[in-house]
Amino acid sequence: MTTKLERRIKIKYRVRNKISGTTERPRMSVFRSNKQIYVQVIDDLSGRTLAAASSLGMEAMPKKEQAAKVGELIAKKAQEAGITTVVFDRNGYLYHGRIKEVADAARNGGLKF
């Protein structure tokens, strides 16, 4: 029997082998810890992070609201960098809760998945 972490890592590597970010369509990777949420827009061909946002230093609010704010922030930063379309990498997490909030807020902010 595998633990939740082992399951997530197995899914993460399986998906990572199938998707890759390019300069025209970079990968938007989400990492979720118990207290914070981090999002990066990554060009895998050059190995560079094009935009990043996190909930570090934000005012105290419920985690889902924090995730939505981070989604709006990454959409704004990505558009400033000239990025309109991304490949969404949920990093092995279920598409539910905070991960879904980040994705929905980024879509509402103007990013296309």
Swiss-Prot record:
It comes from the Bacteria. GO terms for biological process: translation. The keyword Ribonucleoprotein applies. GO terms for cellular component: cytosolic large ribosomal subunit. Transmembrane segments: none annotated. InterPro entries: Ribosomal_uL18_bac-type, Ribosomal_uL18_bac/euk. Belongs to the universal ribosomal protein uL18 family. This is one of the proteins that bind and probably mediate the attachment of the 5S RNA into the large ribosomal subunit, where it forms part of the central protuberance. Part of the 50S ribosomal subunit; part of the 5S rRNA/L5/L18/L25 subcomplex. Contacts the 5S and 23S rRNAs. HAMAP family: Ribosomal_uL18_B. This is Large ribosomal subunit protein uL18. It comes from Phocaeicola vulgatus (strain ATCC 8482 / DSM 1447 / JCM 5826 / CCUG 4940 / NBRC 14291 / NCTC 11154). The lineage of its organism: Bacteria, Pseudomonadati, Bacteroidota, Bacteroidia, Bacteroidales.
